[in-house]
Amino acid sequence: MFELINVSKKFGHTQVLDNITLSLSPGSRTAIVGPSGSGKTTLLRLIAGFEMPDSGQITMRGMPLFSPTVSVPAHQRKIGFVPQEGALFPHLTVEENIGWGIRASRQERRKQVEALMDRVSLDRQLARHWPHEISGGQQQRVALARALAQQPALMLLDEPFSALDTGLRATTRKATADLLSEAGVAAVLVTHDQNEALSFAEQIAVIRHGRFAQVGTPQAVYSQPVDEETALFLGDALILTAEVANGKARCLVGDVPVDDNRAQGVRRIMLRPEPLMITPASAGETALQATVLDIDFAGYLSTLTLGFTDRAQTLTLNTVTPQLLLPGTPVALKITGHARVFAA
């Protein structure tokens, strides 16, 4: 078990982290997600031991790494670190990068390096290559192998996939998650990419202004965000004002079931795109009627602007487009799920 307990950090008069508490179980994967300047990288640096908190405690396996009386240096923490773009030593070969820090004979070190290359699916023929001679994805695997060589109990990943192209980023992320799980190494990923966080982690911590706004499973923070800002940060969301009563919200898109039967009065609600079904209207349609005013077609997802004959308001939303809808097309709007009701 790794724990942060009431950890705070200031730089000058700026409160960068404020009373952060987080628990990680062995072999688990946690993503810390938030906008630039929210404190993500500073938090990783405190965990790694590159910086020290002003207050609070950091423990691993019940032993203090930082407390008012203890401060374990970074090289003694058994924590691996993979920074952005790998940060390989340019003057060392792939083999030398991975073997850096392994205290063993030359023969034993080479044996361990080969085993690590196999573990991260790197061709052994790359061992004598220089970092600039291999691809970005291969460089990240070298950085991961180098970190794993220290047999860490915890792995820190500071936006390590951000420099990769979209397809390579997804495959490298999946391979990294699988590898860490197989090795039983707990991992903390820092990212500003919500999709990356949701797909990588078993626990999401949303950080904002140096505080955790919400911590929970990816499913919980996505479908039950604590507030509007968290909802919009984690993905496309339709935020509406509604009159809530008896388990339903009356709003611009009609009467929508809500996730809190106790909620009453004027409230703000959230709908994700998934339960919104938009189809060309047919004769005798009983669903809510609207007209496409504008469409920004982007393949799988499109941005639609809808107008309603009996309402002055318009509605703009991102949604799956089953077929190309042209401006002027009458459509039917159906809600197949529940809306999230935010606290009053």
Which sequence ranges carry the predicted segments?
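The feature captures the beta-strand-to-loop junction immediately N-terminal to the Walker
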Residues: V33-P35
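Helix-to-loop junction immediately C-terminal to a conserved catalytic motif
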Residues: A48
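Conserved coupling/switch loops of ABC nucleotide-binding domains, chiefly the family-specific signature
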Residues: D54-Q57, H209
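Conserved ABC transporter NBD signature motif
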Residues: G56-S67
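ABC ATPase nucleotide-binding domains
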Residues: K78-G80, T93-E229
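Glycine/charge-rich catalytic "coupling/switch" loops of P-loop NTPases
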Residues: R250-I295, P322-A344
